């Protein structure tokens, strides 16, 4: 069974638009927070990955979301994040947002293991995800 993690977020007034509901980009920010919480739970914090492997990180290739119910200030949101398909250079993450057990949003991200590409300005290049990183991401969660 692949790793999963939960992240809890309290919606603040500043997260909302003039209608008093969460402004949609905030959900993508919270997906990013939850993604790195999953990596940290696997013993793979971003700073350590950058130092050890010289990567930029796991930039997004795709991001999508299906919105079910609006969220408002002071809502306590739980994000259940799990690893989806893992390929040679990319991985998929799935985020299920809920409030009091009710589904709010489902989001999906595809990220790529990336290094700087020194042959072009601001360039990135995809590389294979190291086997030890794959092993940590796919290991069963400790009891």
Model-identified regions with their sequence ranges:
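A contiguous binding-surface segment within folded domains or other stable secondary-structure elements
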Residues: 52-75
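Intrinsic disorder/low-structure terminal segments
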Residues: 23-27, 66, 96
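Hot-dog-fold acyl-thioester-processing enzymes
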Residues: 1-60, 116-143
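HotDog/MaoC-like acyl-thioester-processing domains
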Residues: 7, 67-76, 83-143
């Amino acid at each position: 069974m692949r790793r999963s993690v939960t992240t809890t977020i309290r919606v603040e007034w500043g997260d909302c638009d003039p209608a008093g509901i969460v402004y949609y980009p905030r959900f993508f920010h919270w997906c990013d927070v939850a993604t790195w919480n999953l990596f940290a739970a696997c013993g793979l914090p971003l700073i350590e990955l950058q130092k050890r492997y010289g990567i930029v990180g796991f930039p997004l290739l795709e991001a999508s979301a299906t919105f079910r119910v609006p969220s408002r200030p002071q809502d306590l949101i739980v994000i259940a994040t799990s690893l989806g398909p893992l390929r040679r250079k990319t991985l998929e993450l799935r985020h299920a947002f809920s409030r009091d057990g009710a589904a709010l949003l489902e989001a999906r991200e595809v990220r790529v293991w990336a290094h700087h590409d020194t042959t072009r300005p601001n360039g990135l290049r995809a590389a294979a995800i190291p086997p030890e990183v794959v092993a940590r991401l796919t290991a069963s969660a400790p009891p």
